[in-house]
Amino acid sequence: MKRLLTAMMLFGLALVAGVQAADLQVGDMAPDFSLKASDGHMYKLSDFKGKRAVVLAWYPKAFTSGCTIECKSLAEKGDLIKKFDVAYFMVSVDTVEQAKAFGEAHNADFPLLSDPDKKTADAYGTLRDYGGSIGVVSQRWTFYIGKDGRIAAIDKAVKPATSAEDVAARLAELKIPAK
C-alpha cells in the first residue's frame, strides 16, 4: 500500500511538473531560443532583451491552408506591424528549407524561424499531435514578448485571415512604442 501511494504521488508530481513546464503565463520569462531562419540568420531571443519587443507567431505546418492564409496576411499587411518597434517572426517545427520555400512562395519579408528538433516549441508549450500525415507540430499561438523578456500576451485563438491586423491591434493595446 505504501509503495502504491508513493508511486501515485511521484506520478502526480511528474504530471504537475510537465504541465508547469509547458503552461507559460503572462508575466513569465519567455524561454530563450537560438533558431535558424529562412533568411539564413540565427536568431536568439536574448539578443532582443532590453532592445525590442518580439512577436512569435507559431504555426503548424508550411503550405497548409490556415498557415498559408496567415503567412499571406502577415506578408501583405506587415506594414501595420512594422510601425511598431518590434521584431516579428513566424515559427514552426518545419525544416529551415521548408520555412524558406514557404516564405518565398508568399513573399514574406520577415524571417520564418525553424525548430525541427521541437525543443523551443516544447518550451513554449505549443506542441500538439494532430495525427495522420501532419503528426506532432505546433499549435497556432502567438506570443508577445516585452523588451524585458517577459511574456506580455498569448493569443491562443489566432485568426489566420486577420493575423496582421490582430497583431498590430495587440501591439497597440500593449503600448509597444512606434518606431
Per-region residue spans from a language model:
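Bacterial N-terminal signal peptides
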Residues: 7-16
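Structural microenvironment flanking redox-active thiols in thiol-disulfide oxidoreductases
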Residues: 63, 68-109, 116-120
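Short active-site neighborhood of thiol/selenol oxidoreductases, capturing the structured segment around
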Residues: 47-68
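Short, acidic, Ser/Thr-enriched surface-loop or helix-capping motifs
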Residues: 24, 37-38, 115, 145-146
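Positively charged n-region of N-terminal signal peptides that target proteins for export
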Residues: 1-4
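Thiol-/selenol-based redox modules, centered on thioredoxin-like
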Residues: 137-179
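A short beta-strand-turn-helix
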Residues: 34-53
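Sec/Tat signal peptide C-region and signal peptidase I cleavage site
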Residues: 16-23
